[in-house]
């Protein structure tokens, strides 16, 4: 989940892992271009939170994509400045 959403300029991404996993957490714009990698590391099972500060980006819709093990999750978020 992402809270707050819409956000300005930062939001917190919450996710849970059922087992230890390598996590890749990336943000893409509506054109499909990757704008940042927030994580590309091993994480232990459990609940985690990461803060994304988007102060250098333009207002718009962004997609946060979480890849953990063989699972993918996508969350749409809106940056309003």
Language-model segments: residues:
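C-terminal outer-membrane/trafficking sorting elements
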Residues: 1-3, 7-81
């Amino acid at each position: 989940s992402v809270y707050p959403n819409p956000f300005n300029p930062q939001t917190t991404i919450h996710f849970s892992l059922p087992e230890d996993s390598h996590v890749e957490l990336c943000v893409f714009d509506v054109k499909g271009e990757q704008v940042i990698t927030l994580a590309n590391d091993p994480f232990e099972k459990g609940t985690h939170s990461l803060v994304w500060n988007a102060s250098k980006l333009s207002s718009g819709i962004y997609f946060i994509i979480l890849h953990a093990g063989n699972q993918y999750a996508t969350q749409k978020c809106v940056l309003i400045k």
